Amino acid sequence: MKSFWSRIAIALLFITVTFSAKAEFGQWCVADSQIPDYVTQAALDWACQHGGADCSKIQPNQPCFLPNTLKDHASVVFNSYYQSYKHMGADCYFSSAAILTQRDPSHGSCHFEYIK
């Protein structure tokens, strides 16, 4: 009986350690689909022109050009800015045009960077 409980305790310890090791979640900054396009466009323009975001990935023939929608392009740019500057105090707000998600928005050849 003692051996049985020892095995159970070891199994539970193993499960706990395994799940806690995988419990680190990333955060990506993406466009909020509920926000009007004009707000999203203004935030995208600011991030590309003044914010220092990498907007090269959303250009034609680049990995994040497709799908060619405002929300998809804004998500790539907002995340670029957020990942680059979050350790310097940047947030994922963009005049309410963006939100944080713990779900990696990468798709196809378009990789959304995550910096710990």
Please provide the spans of the model-predicted regions.
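Folded extracytoplasmic luminal domains of secretory or organellar precursors
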Residues: 2-116
